[in-house]
Amino acid sequence: MFKIKFIDKEHREFFKEKYNSLQGYRKTDVYYLSLIYLLGIDENTRNNFNKIFDIDKGEINIEALHCPWQTSSSEKVTRLAFNLWNSCNYDSREDYFNDKYSSEYNPSNIFCCSYAPYFYEGIKLRFPEYTRTLQNELENE
């Protein structure tokens, strides 16, 4: 595995804590790793992790996008984590049942923030089989 970059000490500690917790559930696959990494980027998503994701059930909470603690940046973090978790493109349960996709999941909307370099890290965690070659090439230059 490649060396993971963290935005700050709190992000690193959050990731380690959640990873250790997931080991107890035997849930340390790429889906979980990417999700806990991404939700650890922003202080709001770290502090409200249990409102966003239920580790016991392995379920995201789409309605967390509408919580008052969300900021535009934490919404981007949440959307990318949701999309990489299960290809979610919805902003509510109602949208899901009506098959109404949200344009807020488009890369042009998600990546236009200071977290973009860390979003790439989350993608590398989720898709190591596709990003390993690029990582190896960059390291050999």
Where are these regions (language model features)?
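Extended, charge-biased low-complexity segments
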Residues: 1-79, 86-141
